[in-house]
């Protein structure tokens, strides 16, 4: 996962790495294991990561995992389809939470 794009190096980022070097190492080891072939192949895992990166709105994750998905053989169409799945899930959650707003309105209106 060495070629996953990360935020540009800065003094603050360097200090974060120094302050938690063992945590950095553990996270990189976790990433290496998680993104290895397993029950899901690397391409599928990268497509999942593309979708999640869009839901979490992490620009570095989007860049890194789009590159990772392409490296693992994903097509533009597959990458965009993963993004559309993420968009539907995010919109679906907002739609589902409308029930909370309706419950609050019922409380306000005394229903």
From Swiss-Prot:
InterPro entries associated with the record: AhpD-like (IPR029032), AhpD_core (IPR004675), CMD-like (IPR003779)
Domain of life according to the entry: Bacteria
Transmembrane feature ranges: none
Signal peptide positions (record): none
Pfam family, one: CMD
One GO molecular-function entry: peroxiredoxin activity
PANTHER family noted in UniProt: ALKYL HYDROPEROXIDE REDUCTASE AHPD, BLR3452 PROTEIN
Official protein name in the record: Uncharacterized protein 4 in cox locus
